[in-house]
Amino acid sequence: MKQNIAHIALVVNDYDEAIKFYTEKLSFTLIEDTPQSETKRWVLVAPKGSEECSLLLAKGVGEEQRSRIGNQTGGRVFLFLRTDDFWRDYRNMQQQGITFVREPKTEEYGTVAVFEDLYGNLWDLVEFKK
């Protein structure tokens, strides 16, 4: 039996501002943007070259969902962006104005730094040791 995680829902404030951030600042690919109703869209983005898992940008509806925007994991790192060249991507992200909240450091498993997305969700940029 083969299984994999296809999508991870990320609650956002606005579809278009989230698409702009992920495609322009992080250079993700917009995979799909399909209207489902007048207020709901099916929006998928993923890092270039990613084939199995993507982010489903889900607009927060109602007070409870909107209260989670930017803090879906209670202040813990939420997502992990793996790279094949840490320093290349770190410099590119700095040039794009990405805010790093923890500076790069070398760990037993590789090189890592923590950054925020446009809403404040925490991500690891990580290059694992071979």
Protein language model features and the residues they cover:
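Vicinal oxygen chelate
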Residues: 1-6, 29-82, 90-118, 126-130
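Conserved beta-strand-loop-alpha-helix junction that forms the acyl-donor binding cleft
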Residues: 12-15, 36-38
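Conserved active-site tyrosine of GNAT-family acetyltransferases
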Residues: 18-23, 93, 120
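Helix N-cap motif at beta-to-alpha junctions
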Residues: 14-15, 84-87
